[in-house]
């Protein structure tokens, strides 16, 4: 299956109306493949462009016993198969500079986790791959302080950049969304994504793991589209209550089509676009 070049992919993302969607972690190949096909079908029905997302290693879990994923080698094998069989581009994250090159052999978009958004060596390594790079804004970072991350990527020779808003720390075990961050970060000349599922997370809220309030996902996602966001990030799962990672804030896969149609309708409104 032919996939877009990095330049073509970034141009498509800059044209707005897209989603990055999939399970939090690659917990099971069949679940991931089922989700990828469902994401593609729901996105096509809503007239949206889709990218499959999932992590091969969740390095910043709350507990030492938390599920992390299949690891680099198996994770890349799974993502390569999903990419080929679903026809969707894929996005996945890296945590160390040396992971950039092997991940770039498979991933269309390399993602920098929120907690690592200031790590210069990581950003430079991701930029050096030539892939689209999605940097998630740290929960502790002001929107205007993401400009240096963009400048680091550009200084390393990469203009294919996305920034993602995923909520800001609001006291202990809670996040809040300031939608002013969307136009602020768009002002850096890059497309901006809104992470509707991590924004309803309650970090560490369950003691040994994070909680979440998935019932708020639709209203936060709609608000982001109304605020002019370019794309929406959604973690989804066939059975969120049984997911091995971020289940409390993941969106049920069978409810994805309806949500995407709502977002598509909002994107179509002239005053939003």
Curated annotation (Swiss-Prot):
InterPro entries assigned: Aldolase_TIM (IPR013785), DAHP1/KDSA (IPR006218), KDO8P_synthase (IPR006269)
Catalytic activity, EC: 2.5.1.55
Catalytic activity field: D-arabinose 5-phosphate + phosphoenolpyruvate + H2O = 3-deoxy-alpha-D-manno-2-octulosonate-8-phosphate + phosphate
SUPFAM superfamilies linked: Aldolase
Entry superkingdom: Bacteria
MF GO annotations: 3-deoxy-8-phosphooctulonate synthase activity
Cellular compartments annotated: Cytoplasm
UniProt-listed Pfam families: DAHP_synth_1 (PF00793)
UniProt-listed GO biological process terms: keto-3-deoxy-D-manno-octulosonic acid biosynthetic process
Class in the EC hierarchy, top level: transferase
Pathway recorded for this protein: Carbohydrate biosynthesis; 3-deoxy-D-manno-octulosonate biosynthesis; 3-deoxy-D-manno-octulosonate from D-ribulose 5-phosphate: step 2/3; Bacterial outer membrane biogenesis; lipopolysaccharide biosynthesis
Keywords from the named record: Cytoplasm, Lipopolysaccharide biosynthesis, Transferase
Cellular component GO terms, alphabetical: cytoplasm
PANTHER family named in the record: PHOSPHO-2-DEHYDRO-3-DEOXYHEPTONATE ALDOLASE
Family: Belongs to the KdsA family.
Classification via NCBIfam families: KDO8P_synth, PRK05198.1
Protein name per Swiss-Prot or TrEMBL: 2-dehydro-3-deoxyphosphooctonate aldolase
Origin organism lineage: Bacteria, Pseudomonadati, Thermodesulfobacteriota, Desulfovibrionia, Desulfovibrionales
Gene: kdsA
């Amino acid at each position: 299956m032919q996939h877009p070049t990095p330049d073509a992919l970034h141009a498509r993302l800059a044209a707005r109306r897209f989603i990055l969607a999939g399970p939090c972690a690659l917990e099971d190949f069949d679940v991931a493949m089922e989700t990828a096909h469902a994401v593609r079908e729901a996105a096509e029905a809503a007239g949206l462009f889709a990218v499959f997302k999932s992590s091969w290693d969740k390095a910043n879990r709350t507990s030492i016993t938390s599920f992390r994923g299949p690891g680099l080698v198996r994770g890349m094998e799974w993502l390569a198969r999903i990419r080929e069989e679903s026809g969707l581009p894929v996005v996945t994250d890296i945590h160390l500079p040396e992971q950039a090159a092997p991940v770039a052999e498979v991933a269309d978009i390399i993602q920098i986790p929120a907690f690592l958004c200031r790590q210069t060596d990581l950003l430079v390594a991701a930029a050096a791959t030539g892939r689209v790079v999605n940097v998630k804004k740290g929960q502790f970072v002001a929107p205007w302080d993401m400009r240096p991350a963009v400048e680091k990527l550009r200084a390393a020779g990469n203009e294919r950049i996305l920034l993602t808003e995923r909520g800001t720390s609001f006291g202990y075990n809670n996040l809040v969304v300031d939608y002013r961050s969307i136009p602020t970060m768009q002002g850096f000349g890059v497309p901006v994504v809104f992470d509707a599922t991590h924004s309803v997370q309650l970090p560490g809220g369950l003691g040994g793991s994070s909680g979440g309030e998935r019932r708020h996902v639709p209203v936060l996602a709609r608000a982001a589209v109304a605020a002019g966001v370019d794309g929406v990030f959604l973690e989804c799962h066939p059975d969120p209550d049984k997911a091995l990672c971020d289940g409390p804030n993941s969106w049920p896969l069978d409810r994805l089509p309806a949500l995407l149609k709502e977002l598509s309708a909002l994107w179509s409104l002239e005053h939003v676009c």
